[in-house]
Amino acid sequence: SNYRMGALRPNQFGVDDAHVKEYVESVAKASGEFLEIVNYNLAGQQYAIAGTIAGLKALKADSARRVAAFGGKPAFMLVPGIDVPFHSTLLRKGVPEFRDKLDALLPAYIDYRGRLVDRYIPNLVASPFEMTKEFAAKILEVVPSERIKAALDDPAVWDSYAADDQKLGRLLLTELLSWQFASPVRWIETQALLFGKREQGGLGVEEYVEVGLGNAPTLANLGAKTLRLPEFAGNDTVVYNVGRDEGRVYMTDTDSLVSDDEPEETAAPVETAPAGGSAVAKLGSSAAADAAPAAVAAPAPAAPVSAAPAGAPSGAAAPAGAPS
């Protein structure tokens, strides 16, 4: 294959999140090679780039030149073992076949309103799933879905979908998933939605749990790094990985009720009862407290709104290894 994938850290040469897409496009244009951001993982700091071998070499050289002038650390590295331009527009020709396969495999009945509405965050649009015309329009804003366009262009066609939850839900879900594999993973926006405060349009998630291997907590690490960005200052969201933090997730760990910052009370001496009598122990309050460990609240990936992350998983917010 003539394709590879690389990871780019534009903050190491002074390019921010708002300008990284423009930067990659400029290198593609100058080199005459294909380059595309396919994973937006961590604002300003981590992006996956799909491209031709020559295109990625040009990106590596240009970023190295900029790093030298800026004084940053190495900003580009190849991702080993990948020779397919995943999540790039080059895969769009495969969307119809993938859609047909999905349609054949999805259950005949899905409780779309109960299980997906306001719970599933597709990375294609980086917003909660809805059964509305406005949500369908969001899909059409990012991909040229002929099925969505046909439904939106004709009021009678849309009304036929709107009258049947199974028909409408299946249309939206198959389009979201089939187009996702040929579209970038918008994990930066998905995390901003999850961690953002409610008064600012976010979901206000209090506890975030990655379901994945404890020795490779990709999404948990991205979440923790995102929460350290200036725009999330003061956010107290707790991030877990189900393998790494099993005790917390399943409430099998124990915490002392005594704060580490507070001195423990000294237990009173145990008095020995006379022979033939019962022993009477006078214990300090700290000993009693230690005997009753505090329960740990069960984590919920989304606070009042439970969202299932993507893809980085693809298409589902959960979000996307690096999300995919």
Regions found by a protein language model. Give the residues of each.
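FabD-like malonyl-/acyl-CoA
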Residues: 1-19, 204-249, 253, 257-258
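Short amphipathic beta-strand starts and helix->beta connectors
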Residues: 1, 26-36
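Acyltransferase
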Residues: 68-207, 216, 225-231, 259
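Helix N-cap motif at beta-to-alpha junctions
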Residues: 12, 51-58
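Short amphipathic alpha-helices in soluble, non-transmembrane regions
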Residues: 19-25, 56-68
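A generic structural motif
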Residues: 45-50
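Short beta-strand
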Residues: 36-42, 112-113
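Long, low-complexity intrinsically disordered regions
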Residues: 262-323
